[in-house]
UniProtKB/Swiss-Prot annotation:
Its main location: cytoplasm. It comes from the Bacteria. One of its GO terms (biological process) is cellular response to heat. The keyword Cytoplasm applies. This is Lon protease. Residues 30-225 form the Lon N-terminal domain.
Length: 813
C-alpha cells in the first residue's frame, strides 16, 4: 500500500531548538520505516499514513517506547515489501509526535525530523527493519560572508516567487518563511516542500555542507519557476485555442452548408467513397480489419489536424492498389511470337523463355512468375524488349530505373510517422499499373549503390524471391502485398557488380552483341523506317543500300548494340529532310559516298589483318564492351642478358600470361628446336599496340606463346590466322569467353582461320551458321597443337642471327 504525500504544515523552530537537536544523542541501532515519495528533513514536521503491516507493527511498538525511529525514502517505488536493497542509505532520525488509528485500519503518525544518519549495517528484516546507523554532522557556513548572505537571499526571493505563481500553496507559507530565524532550518523547510523529484530531494538530504545544499536547492527552485512559467503560458494559450476552435467550428459549419449547396465533397462524402471502394476489394480478413481500424481513426481526427492528410492518403493507397486484380493474359503463342519477332531481331533465347512461360501459364494458371535478368552490352534492346513482352502477354508495362538508387526506402518505402512519407517505388509502380500482374522492368540493376541509409540491393532480395514476394511488406503500406504474379525483368550490363545473393535469385539470360549481318537487318527492318517516320519522310523519299549501312556500321560506330547506328542513320535522314524542305535536289538512294559526304570523315579505323614477313607478329582476339576486336601481338629480340620487357599498358593477368608462355617455351626448347643459351644472351621485348588502351585477361595466352616461339625460331606465322585461349605451364589450352564477338571481329578483319580451345566448340555451335561460313576453325587441347598449326617450316626472309658463340674452355692449371 502506498504511503501518502505530506499535508501542508508550517512548523517553526528557533535556533536554540536547532542547537539542542544537534547535541541530542540517539541509539546506534534504529528501527527503519521506509516511505514512498517523501524525504524527511531535520526540524520539519510531517504527517504520514502507514499502511504496510511491518510499518504498523514498528510504529505501534515504538510509539509506546521512546518514539524514536529512522525514516528512509524508498528508492524502488514499485516494491510493495521493500528490503534494504530497495531503500536509500541516508535517512533522518524522527520523533513520533502523535499517532491516530483510522477506521479503515490505516495508521497516521505525525513525526518531526531530528538528525541525518547513514545506514551502516542491516540488523534485522522481521518483524520490521532494523539497522546499525551512524549520525551525520552538518557543516554550518560563516553567516558573516557576503556570498552566504547573497545565496540565502536568492533562496528566499525564489521561494517568494514560487508562492506568488502557484495558487495551490497556502498564503500562510509566506508568513512562515519570513518568520524563520534559522538559516539552516530554512533550507530544510524549503527542501521538504519544493516541487521536485524524489532523487533530487534525496540529494539535498545527503549534502553535509549547508552551502552546497542551498546552492542545489536554488537550482531546483529556478527549474520549478521555469515550469510554472511554461504552465502559465500553456494555460493562456489553451484559452486562446479554445476561442479559436469555437470560431473554427462555426466557420466549418458555414463551409459545410456552402459545400452542400455547391455539390462539393465533404469529409463525410470522402469517407463514404473510400468505404464503397473498400467493399469491392479482394482483401484478406487481416487487411480489411486494418482498413476498418485506420478508417475509424480517420473519422475521429479533425480535418485540420496534420495527421489527417497522412491517414487519408494512406487509406486512398489501400483502396487504389490492385489486390488480386489480374489482367487477362493472351495465351495465343503464335501471336506472341509474331509480336516479339516484329519488335526485335534475334534475341532467340529470351523469346524462347517468354514463350515457355506463356505455355506453362496456359496449362497451369496459378504459376509463379519467373524472375529474369537480361545481361548484355548497352544498346542491344534489353529494356525495349520488356515493352514487347508486355505487349505479347497483353499486360501492363512498368519500368523502374535503379541506376544511382542508394536509399533502401526507395524500395521499401518510408514509415508513416515521417513527414512526406510515401510507399516504395515497387508499390507505386503496381498502383500505376492498376493490375497485380504487370511486366515490371528493373532497369540497370547492376548500378545500384549503397550508403549509410541502407542497401537497396538487400531490400530487393525479398522482392525478387518467388518464395517470399507473395508476402512483400512495404514500410508505408504496413500490410503484406502479393508480388508473386508480377513478371519482373531486370536488365544489366555486368554481373560482377550485382550482389551474389541477388544474382542467385534471378534467371540470367545473356544477350550478346549483334553481328554485322544482324545489324544490317535491324537497320533495314526497324531503324530506317522508324527514323523516316520520326522525321516526316515517306518510304519513297529515301532508301539505303546495304553498302551504305555497312559503311555506317564499320566506320562510324563501334558498339555491340545499335544505339549509335540509329543516331547516325537519323543524321543522314535529317540531312535529306532539309533537302526536301528546301526543295533542293538530292539523291534518293544512299550510297557509301553519300554517307561520307553527310557524316564527314570516318570516326573509327577499321580493324584489318595485315600480313608481315616478320617473326613474332601474331593476331590475337579480344573482347570489349563494344564487341570483339583483333589484337596484334609483337615480340622482338636483341642482344643482351635475358631481360624481359612488356609494354602496351598490359594488366597483371596479361603480364602473368606472358611470363607463363616464356616459361613453357624454355621448358620445351628441345622439342621446338631452340638453343637454350639464347635466353641468357638475348633480351626479349613483347608489345601490344594501341598503347593508350588498357588490356588485360588470360585469353591472349596461346597468342603470346606462338609469338615467342616464332621470335626464338625466326619461323613464319601462317597468314590470315587468329587465335584466342588461355595457356597453362603444363601446356594445356583452356577455354575463354566472348567467343561470338571475337569470331565476328576476326571475320570483319579478313581472318580465314581461327585456333580455339576444344572446350569452346560449344560456343561456335550457338553462332548462326551463315555468319561463320567462310571461316575454318582449329580446336586444340595443347600448346604443341597450336604451334603445329600456326608455325610454318620456312623462316622469314631476313632472320635474326640467334647463334650463341662458344665460350672458350678454361685451361687446367
Amino acid at each position: 500500500m502506498l504511503d501518502t504525500e505530506p499535508v501542508d504544515m508550517i512548523p517553526l523552530i528557533t535556533p536554540e531548538e536547532e542547537a539542542e537537536m544537534d547535541k541530542e544523542e540517539f541509539p546506534s541501532v534504529l528501527p527503519i520505516l521506509p516511505v514512498r515519495n517523501i524525504v524527511l528533513f531535520p526540524g520539519v514536521v510531517l504527517p504520514i499514513t502507514v499502511g504496510r503491516q511491518k510499518s504498523i507493527r514498528l510504529v505501534k511498538k515504538f510509539y509506546k517506547g521512546d518514539r524514536t525511529i529512522g525514516v528512509v525514502a524508498q528508492e524502488n517505488q514499485k516494491s510493495e515489501e521493500p528490503s534494504f536493497q530497495d531503500i536509500f542509505k541516508v535517512g533522518t532520525v524522527a520523533k513520533i509526535l502523535r499517532m491516530f488509528v483510522l477506521p479503515d485500519g490505516n495508521t497516521t503518525i505525525i513525526i518531526q525530523g531530528k538528525r541525518r544518519f547513514k545506514i551502516e549495517e542491516q540488523v534485522q528484516d522481521e518483524p520490521f527493519m532494523q539497522a546499525k546507523v551512524s549520525m551525520l554532522k552538518d557543516i554550518h557556513p560563516d553567516m558573516s560572508k557576503k556570498e552566504v548572505k547573497a545565496l540565502l537571499q536568492s533562496v528566499k526571493e525564489s521561494a517568494t516567487k514560487i508562492l506568488k505563481m502557484n495558487p495551490e500553496i497556502p498564503q500562510d507559507a509566506q508568513i512562515a518563511i519570513n518568520n524563520i530565524e534559522s538559516e539552516n532550518f530554512l533550507t530544510h523547510f524549503l527542501s521538504s516542500n519544493i516541487n521536485a523529484e524524489l532523487k533530487d530531494k534525496q540529494k539535498l538530504l545527503e549534502f553535509d555542507d549547508a552551502v552546497e545544499r542551498a546552492t542545489w536547492l536554488l537550482q531546483l527552485m529556478d527549474k520549478d519557476i521555469q515550469m510554472l512559467e511554461i504552465k502559465r503560458e500553456i494555460h493562456t494559450k489553451v484559452h486562446t485555442d479554445i476561442d479559436q476552435q469555437q470560431r473554427d467550428y462555426f466557420l466549418r459549419q458555414q463551409i459545410k452548408v456552402l459545400q452542400d449547396e455547391l455539390g462539393d465533397f465533404s469529409s463525410e462524402q470522402e469517407f463514404e467513397r473510400l468505404k464503397e471502394k473498400a467493399l469491392t476489394k479482394k482483401w484478406s480478413d487481416k487487411v480489411r480489419a486494418h482498413f476498418d481500424k485506420e478508417m475509424s481513426k480517420l473519422q475521429r481526427v479533425n480535418p485540420m489536424a496534420p495527421d489527417y492528410p497522412v491517414t487519408f492518403n494512406y487509406l486512398e493507397l489501400l483502396v487504389d492498389l490492385p489486390w488480386g486484380e489480374n489482367s487477362t493474359d493472351n495465351f495465343d503463342l503464335v501471336r506472341a511470337k509474331e509480336i516479339l519477332d516484329e519488335d526485335h531481331f534475334g534475341l532467340t533465347k529470351v523469346k524462347q523463355r517468354i514463350l515457355e512461360y506463356l505455355a506453362v501459364l496456359k496449362l497451369k494458371n496459378n504459376m509463379k512468375a519467373p524472375i529474369l535478368c537480361l545481361y548484355g552490352p548497352p544498346g542491344v534492346g534489353k529494356t525495349s524488349l520488356g515493352k514487347s513482352i508486355a505487349k505479347a502477354l497483353d499486360r501492363k508495362y512498368i519500368r523502374m530505373s535503379l541506376g544511382g538508387v542508394h536509399d533502401e526506402s526507395e524500395i521499401r518505402g518510408h514509415r508513416k510517422t515521417y513527414i512526406g512519407a510515401m510507399p516504395g517505388k515497387i508499390i507505386q509502380g503496381i498502383k500505376r499499373s492498376e493490375t497485380s500482374n504487370p511486366v515490371f522492368i528493373l532497369d540497370e540493376i547492376d548500378k545500384i549503390s549503397k550508403d549509410f541509409r541502407g542497401d537497396p540491393s538487400s531490400a530487393l532480395l525479398e522482392v525478387l524471391d518467388p518464395e517470399q514476394n507473395s508476402s512483400f511488406m512495404d514500410n508505408f503500406l504496413e500490410v503484406e502485398y502479393d508480388l508473386s504474379k508480377v513478371l519482373f525483368i531486370a536488365t544489366s550490363n555486368a554481373l560482377d557488380t550485382i550482389q551474389p545473393a541477388l544474382r542467385d535469385r534471378m534467371e540470367i539470360i545473356e544477350i550478346n552483341g549483334y553481328t554485322l549481318e544482324e545489324k544490317i537487318q535491324i537497320a533495314k527492318k526497324y531503324l530506317i523506317p522508324k527514323q523516316k517516320e520520326e522525321h516526316g519522310l515517306k518510304a519513297k523519299d529515301i532508301s539505303f543500300t546495304d553498302a551504305a549501312i555497312v559503311k555506317i556500321i564499320e566506320d562510324y560506330t563501334r558498339e555491340s548494340g545499335v544505339r549509335n547506328l540509329e543516331r547516325k542513320i537519323g543524321a543522314v535522314v535529317r540531312n535529306i529532310a532539309v533537302a526536301i524542305a528546301m526543295e533542293t535536289a538530292y539523291t534518293k538512294k544512299i550510297q557509301p559516298a553519300q554517307v561520307r559526304e553527310i557524316l564527314g570523315s570516318e570516326d573509327f579505323e577499321k580493324d584489318t589483318y595485315q600480313q608481315d614477313d616478320l617473326a613474332g607478329i601474331v593476331t590475337g582476339l579480344a573482347w570489349t564492351p563494344y564487341g570483339g576486336e583483333i589484337l596484334t601481338i609483337e615480340s622482338i629480340i636483341s642482344k643482351g642478358k635475358g631481360k624481359l620487357t612488356l609494354s602496351g599498358q598490359l594488366g597483371d593477368v596479361m603480364k602473368e600470361s606472358a611470363s607463363a608462355a616464356l616459361s613453357l617455351l624454355r621448358a620445351n626448347v628441345d622439342a621446338i628446336g631452340i638453343d637454350h643459351r639464347v635466353f641468357d644472351h638475348f633480351d626479349l621485348h613483347v608489345h601490344v599496340p594501341a598503347g593508350a588502351t588498357p588490356k588485360d585477361g588470360p585469353s591472349a595466352g596461346i597468342a603470346l606463346y606462338t609469338s615467342l616461339a616464332s621470335t626464338f625460331t625466326q619461323r613464319k606465322i601462317k597468314p590470315a590466322l587468329a587465335m584466342t585461349g588461355e595457356i597453362t605451364l603444363r601446356g594445356k589450352v583452356l577455354p575463354v569467353g566472348g567467343i561470338k564477338e571475337k569470331i565476328l571481329a576476326a571475320k570483319r578483319a579478313g581472318i580465314k582461320e581461327i585456333i580455339l580451345s576444344k572446350k569452346n566448340k560449344k560456343d561456335i555451335e550457338e553462332i548462326h551458321p551463315p555468319d561463320i561460313a567462310d571461316l575454318k576453325f582449329h580446336f586444340v587441347e595443347t600448346a604443341d597443337e597450336v604451334l603445329a598449326i600456326a608455325l610454318l617450316k620456312q623462316k622469314i626472309k631476313k632472320p635474326f642471327n640467334l647463334e650463341v658463340p662458344e665460350e672458350p674452355k678454361k685451361k687446367d692449371k
